[in-house]
């Protein structure tokens, strides 16, 4: 496992992290909590140190699950979680709809105390605003300035070691402005980024390079398109979040077909590596990309993603060839990539 500095903080993280939402919710088909805890433990044993959680995942149960799996190695891992959605006054909504945000300093404190309790720890290593809009980030916004001042105070008290933002849930150009605003505060940002979805990559990573503030990326496998198992006939279980993120079965099928046509053109790059490993190597190309947070929901994926040292390295020439394919939209006239909200 490779380890990288999360620039702008004192944290060092595994280049491949673990997004606990895949095992802490039922949105990815892992309904067995014992399996979820085994995967978390196996990830640690295979060198993963960054575990990315959120208080909204199963209304806090995902944080408890992480504690149960990893409490005895707490000081050997980087505990990252998120806040901002009002899970106290607004229960989960059908169809995984967003809950209202509360960015008041008082709510942040309340959320922080609850996460500390559920995670069984005295500090959060990396505390992130969960899907904020620009008014909760930008300098000069009273809402944001008050919130970030309180985050600084919590840091001074030792309750958090570092803070940042996790942007979403939809992938759109609005997040370029949000990501840049976060970096300009000296706060790392987590974005959706993969070789099929690079809307945020170039502008956000360029600003990260200029400011020397780090970036994390989730969904490096484009919601499954780059995992190697999808076909045009793939269907998702009823609780799978991808059923909610595209409005109709026809749109979902079109999204898959569009993505799979692009994936087919990546076959020449698969000598000595799987498609899933290629996706991770590509997204880690920038030195400011501290860690990737793939969706891990079975042992096969876990082993593959934590075995990058065994895969043939991605050369600069190969990286450039893939970028050239992306620049011409893989020769296709239409694109539905980016429609899935994550």
Label every PLM stretch briefly.
Residues 1-81:
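N-terminal binding-site loop/beta-alpha segment at the start of enzyme catalytic domains
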Residues 8-10, 68-75, 117-120, 153-155, ...:
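Acidic (Asp/Glu)-rich catalytic clusters
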Residues 15, 78-82, 126-129, 216-220:
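Non-cysteine beta-strand/loop elements that form the S-adenosyl-L-methionine
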Residues 22-34, 94-109, 135-140:
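Active-site mouth loops of central-metabolism enzymes
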Residues 30-43, 104-118, 171-179:
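Short, acidic/polar
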Residues 76-88, 191-192:
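A short, structured active-site edge motif that brings together acidic residues
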Residues 114-137:
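Active-site groove signature of glycoside hydrolases
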Residues 132-325, 329, 339-342:
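Beta/alpha (TIM)-barrel catalytic core signal, keyed to glycine-rich beta->alpha loops juxtaposed to Asp/Glu
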């Amino acid at each position: 496992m490779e380890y990288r500095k999360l620039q702008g903080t004192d944290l060092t993280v595994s280049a491949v992290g673990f997004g606990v939402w895949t095992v802490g919710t039922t949105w990815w088909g892992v309904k067995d909590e014992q399996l979820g805890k085994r995967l978390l433990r196996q990830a640690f044993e295979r060198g993963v140190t960054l575990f990315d959680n959120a208080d909204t995942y199963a209304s806090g149960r995902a944080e408890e699950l992480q504690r149960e799996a990893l409490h005895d190695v707490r000081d050997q891992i980087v505990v990252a979680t998120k806040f901002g959605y009002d899970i106290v006054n607004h229960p989960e909504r059908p169809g995984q709809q967003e809950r209202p945000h509360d960015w008041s300093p008082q709510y942040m404190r309340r959320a922080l105390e609850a996460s500390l309790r559920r995670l069984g720890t005295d500090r959060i290593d990396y505390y992130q605003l969960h899907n904020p809009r620009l008014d909760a980030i930008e300098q000069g916004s009273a809402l944001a300035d008050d919130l970030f001042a309180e985050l600084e105070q919590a840091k001074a008290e030792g309750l958090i070691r570092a803070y940042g933002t996790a942007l979403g849930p939809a992938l759109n150009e609005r997040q370029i402005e949000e990501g840049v605003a976060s970096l300009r505060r000296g706060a790392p940002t987590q974005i959706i980024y993969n070789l099929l979805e690079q809307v945020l990559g170039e502008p956000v990573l360029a600003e990260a390079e200029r400011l020397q503030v780090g970036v994390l990326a989730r969904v490096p496998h484009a919601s499954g398109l780059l995992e190697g198992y999808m076909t045009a006939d793939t269907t998702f279980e009823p609780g799978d979040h991808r059923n909610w993120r595209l409005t109709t079965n026809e749109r979902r099928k079109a999204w898959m077909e569009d993505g799979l046509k692009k994936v087919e053109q990546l076959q020449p790059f698969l000598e000595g590596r799987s498609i899933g490993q290629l996706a991770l190597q590509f997204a880690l190309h920038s030195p400011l990309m501290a860690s990737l947070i793939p969706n891990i929901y079975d042992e096969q994926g876990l082993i593959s993603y934590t075995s990058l040292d065994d895969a043939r390295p991605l050369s600069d020439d190969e990286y450039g060839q893939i970028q050239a394919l992306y620049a011409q939209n893989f020769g296709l006239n239409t694109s539905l990539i980016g429609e899935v909200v994550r």
